[in-house]
């Protein structure tokens, strides 16, 4: 028995792997940008940092996946947008990265992205769809897709199962690092709308809608099928935020992901400050009203789990608010302000 046949009998289809590479080349080509070196398929992706024009470059990296939202993509057999979710989770984090309030919060331009797919059985058509979504996310973020890995792992995953993760690298001008100390009492909190649930809280989402087919037209969802709302891809905020940073209009940035308002907003500022949120001004999306109703979730807990309709929050000096609104070609929501901390870091009124 030949080695090739032996490997195939163990569940690994080498030819399918080659086919995936051929299928995704046209999608990868869409993401080309200055600085990319080498061709797809090498042992490592290469990028020429000198092409960025940054004088004192600081590299910032982030890695993430899409959590159990992936299980819904598998359940509904829809794979062409989950890749965008993966890119969004990485690049939105490296827009404003820093786990503690006074660590540097970086704003940067994404440079490149790499993806990793692991599966029980390599399906070239399916994984072309996945990578097409990754490429779309990279185009929206201005990042080049310079490499990746598709690992066929029979026995580790079921034949229809797969996992998806990504890794993003961006560059910032050292002099333009955003420090949390710039956020001050009296700053206005501006919210940019989310596209939906994004990619967090899906273990709860799946429990709430476990007995639904996905084709339901719930009255709260304004005529959209449930599955389409649940799989709405995560919004990428890079292009919206870049002009604001270039004009130095933003003191702090918060990516509202897992942990909702309560966990993510305090990462924008120092320990002696707090965010006062006017709940009536938060543009709560219909899906969150449906989740609260059908999941019997306490209202205050919703803000501890979900973005509630705001995916990116900006802390802006009052005198800069109008200019920020001019630059953003979209609705901007004044949802609160920065106050001196008394007890809680986030106060929702």
UniProtKB/Swiss-Prot annotation:
Q: Can you supply one Gene Ontology CC term for this chain's record?
A: cytosol
- The Enzyme Commission number assigned here is 6.3.3.1
**Superkingdom of the source species:** Bacteria
Source organism phylogeny:
Bacteria, Bacillati, Bacillota, Bacilli, Lactobacillales
- What is the recorded name of this protein? Phosphoribosylformylglycinamidine cyclo-ligase
Q: Which family does it belong to?
A: Belongs to the AIR synthase family.
In terms of CDD domains, this protein maps to: PurM
Q: Which residues cross the membrane?
A: none
Keyword Transmembrane helix listed? The answer is: no
What is catalyzed by this enzyme?
Answer: 2-formamido-N(1)-(5-O-phospho-beta-D-ribosyl)acetamidine + ATP = 5-amino-1-(5-phospho-beta-D-ribosyl)imidazole + ADP + phosphate + H(+)
Which UniProt keywords are present, listed alphabetically? ATP-binding, Cytoplasm, Ligase, Nucleotide-binding, Purine biosynthesis
**Which pathway is this protein assigned to?**
Purine metabolism; IMP biosynthesis via de novo pathway; 5-amino-1-(5-phospho-D-ribosyl)imidazole from N(2)-formyl-N(1)-(5-phospho-D-ribosyl)glycinamide: step 2/2
**What subcellular locations does the record give?**
Cytoplasm
Q: Major location, coarse class?
A: cytoplasm
Enzyme class comes to ligase
> Which InterPro entries does the entry link to?
PurM-like_C_dom, PurM-like_C_sf, PurM-like_N, PurM-like_N_sf, PurM_cligase
Q: Does the keyword rRNA processing apply?
A: no
For this entry, list what GO says about its biological process. 'de novo' IMP biosynthetic process; adenine biosynthetic process
List GO molecular-function terms, semicolon-separated. ATP binding; phosphoribosylamine-glycine ligase activity; phosphoribosylformylglycinamidine cyclo-ligase activity
